[in-house]
Amino acid sequence: MTDGYGVVLVAKQFGIDFDAKPILHVKGGGSSAIATVNAWLSMGGEVKALSGRRDLPEELISKCNSELDANLFIDFDDSSDSDGLVLFPSYSSDLYALSNKIDGRWMLIAQHLLAWAVLFSPEEQKNLPSLDLLFRRLVLLETLT
């Protein structure tokens, strides 16, 4: 649950409007890719599945028929050369400095925020910090080590 809706939360953070039926291009077919496609479709977006190391299940590929340009590209295979807005789910000690590359830390933080908001402490949802604040704090903490 948090993988897919974490990507939706990150997309919204980076200005993607789900009222406009945004297009997601996704490469990969593992559980995170499946959750992401399901969440994106449930929010009213459209998806184009690209071949990767693993493909999405056939019943999901049949729902991924967009031929439009992507508002967001997510690469679960870490092999993207897209010039558009790209989310790389994995991360290392290096931060992406390019404006069109979204560091995987955003997805990690979004997943944790959703877990707290939905699973662990829904009664405290309004008191949780913002995605942006947690990202800045994580980066700051990493510089201290």
Language-model segment annotations:
Residues 5, 87-145:
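Adenosine-phosphate binding glycine-rich loop
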Residues 46, 58-59, 67, 123-124, ...:
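Glutamate identity and glutamate-enriched acidic tracts
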Residues 18, 22, 37, 58-60, ...:
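Generic local-structure boundary detector
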Residues 16-17, 63-66, 130:
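Short, solvent-exposed coil/turn linker segments
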Residues 11, 15, 36, 40, ...:
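Hydrophobic, Leu/Ile/Phe/Ala-enriched alpha-helical segments that form helix-helix packing faces
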Residues 1-4, 11-54:
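Glycine-rich adenosine-cofactor-binding loop
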Residues 21-24, 74-76, 122-126:
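A polyampholytic, Gly/Pro-enriched intrinsically disordered region
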Residues 59-108:
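Rossmann-like adenosine-cofactor binding region
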